[in-house]
A protein has these predicted regions:
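Flexible C-terminal active-site loop/helix
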Residues: 4, 8-9, 24-30, 35-36, ...
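Metal- or metallocofactor-binding catalytic centers and their adjacent structured scaffolds
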Residues: 29, 38, 73, 77-150
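Ligand-binding pocket scaffold of soluble enzyme catalytic domains
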Residues: 47, 80, 149, 171, ...
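Short beta-strand elements
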Residues: 66-74, 397-401
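Conserved, mostly hydrophobic/aromatic
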Residues: 76, 100, 138, 151, ...
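Shared catalytic-loop signature of beta/alpha-barrel
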Residues: 98, 114, 269, 275-278, ...
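Proline-centered loop/turn at the N-terminus of a beta-strand
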Residues: 153, 167, 250, 301, ...
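Metal-dependent enolase-superfamily TIM-barrel catalytic cores that perform enediolate-based chemistry
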Residues: 165-297
């Protein structure tokens, strides 16, 4: 990628007659008197530069994953970052290739803080899942490069470990309660101690997705959401779970943002006897200003955050008492740099982390989550996903759950690579919810 009017600090040193701005000798002017498009704003101790930034989209499990590759002027030195917004993957890829990349080419890859602030503020209208995912891809890739240059895993750059591995939770879901609990027993046998339970009902499939048409013919609205059915039958799931699975296993539940604040309180109180570790996404993000009152009235810990698309919104959740656990989709807030700051704020205010990490996050994103998980004292839980063989082929070094834990890679950087030849065999397709929505119109 060629950047017009690109001027480096070392060029100025070798050409003292080149113009500088009134702000000082390190604020260079381009030939037309304006600032160059990509400008190292201070002398660097070496000539390493970002030489290319591009998005790679692949779907080895059918879900489009967006990964950003940042190449440097040192042969073989590159970094990878997760920029996955599955539902709008093409918009993120375009933002990376057309807008974000040109801001970064020519910069020294060590200047992560300044580069990410430049990307964030330069668009004028800031935040949102598209631009923040594009930013995240670059941010995480620069951290990956930093680890590789230092010969250290990224978590050692964040202060080192607070734990050797992180406990994860997985999902047990079914069309019926017995089916859900069968799956839960399989997970327990595999070593999981934390399990999120979901069961089908009107308006939902086994996981909260749109239901199979006609699946609940006795419901007044057989193919649509029935909140009364949900409020009545969800406690039955957890009563059966405690009876069958016992008291030791940790249980969670995801509401998928479907309730009003009052309904969320009703559900939380109904679930109190079953000692859930957390209740997730109890209300829609449009109503997050009501979360403090929900949390204050709930006997169950509240976990929210995966639909947050800005750092200020995440700060408000932590600061204002809206959450017990912060469920960030870390790429949607801009990557590792803001995530580590939010984890530090959470630590100071008594909130724990429980980062979003299902199959619509790339293995690179999992490794980035893991770097924060093992280093922050605020860690609570980590969501997990078991990737298929194709994903492991596309992403060598994909983290693997062993006996209910994720273990960080000792390799420099994040320890995850990208086989682009393998990735090309799995082109992206339209997200399944988009296909479903098109089919019901």
């Amino acid at each position: 990628m060629k950047i017009a009017n690109l001027v480096f600090i070392d060029e100025i040193i070798n050409n003292p007659g080149m113009a500088t701005s009134p702000d000082g000798p390190n604020r260079l002017l381009g030939p037309d008197g304006g600032l160059p498009e990509a400008l190292p704003p201070w002398p660097s101790r070496d000539n390493l530069r970002v030489r290319a930034v591009r998005a790679v989209v692949t779907a080895p499990e059918g879900l489009p994953l967006v990964v950003v590759r940042v190449d440097t002027s040192e042969p073989g030195l590159y970094g990878l970052g997760c920029a996955t917004f599955t539902q709008r993957y093409a918009a993120v890829a375009a933002a990376v290739d057309e807008h974000v990349g040109p801001l970064v080419v020519g910069r020294h890859p060590a200047d992560i803080e300044d580069i990410t602030r430049l990307i964030h503020y330069s668009s004028y209208w800031r935040n949102g899942p598209v631009l923040n995912n594009a930013l995240s891809g670059v941010d995480q890739a620069l951290w990956d490069i930093a680890g590789k240059r230092a010969g250290l895993p990224v978590y050692e750059l964040l202060g080192g470990r607070s734990r050797s591995a992180v406990e994860v939770y997985s999902h047990a879901a079914g069309a019926t309660i017995p089916e859900t609990l069968d799956r839960a027993e399989e997970l327990i046998a595999a070593g999981y101690r934390h399990i999120r339970l979901q069961v089908g009902g009107p308006g939902t499939g086994t996981y909260g997705a749109p239901a199979t048409r006609g699946g609940y013919p006795r419901s007044p609205n057989p193919d649509g959401w029935d909140v009364q059915y949900y409020l009545a039958h969800t406690p039955e799931l957890f009563a059966a779970a405690r009876e069958r699975l016992g008291a030791e296993v940790s249980l969670m539940h995801d509401v998928h943002s479907r309730l009003t604040p009052k309904q969320a309180i009703v559900l939380a109180r109904a679930l109190e006897p079953y000692r859930l570790s957390f209740l997730e996404d109890v209300i829609a993000p449009e109503h997050y200003d009501r979360l403090p009152e929900v949390r204050a009235a709930s006997p169950v810990p509240i976990a929210v955050g995966e639909q947050i698309g800005s750092v200020p919104d995440a700060v408000r959740l932590i600061r204002d008492g809206g959450v017990d656990l912060l469920r960030l989709h870390t790429s949607a807030v801009g990557g590792l740099t803001p995530t580590r700051k939010l984890a530090a704020l959470a630590e100071l205010l008594g909130v724990r982390t429980a980062f979003h990490s299902p199959g619509d996050i790339s293995p690179v994103g999992v490794a980035a989550n893991l770097a924060v998980d093992v280093s922050t004292p605020a860690f609570g839980y980590q969501e997990s996903h078991t990737y298929n063989d194709a994903t492991h082929e596309v992403f060598p070094g994909t983290p693997v759950v062993r006996d209910g834990y994720l273990w960080p890679s000792p390799e420099p950087g994040f320890g995850v690579d990208l086989d682009e030849k393998a990735a090309s065999r799995f082109p992206p397709v339209k997200f399944r919810f988009d296909r479903w929505a098109a089919g019901v119109r």
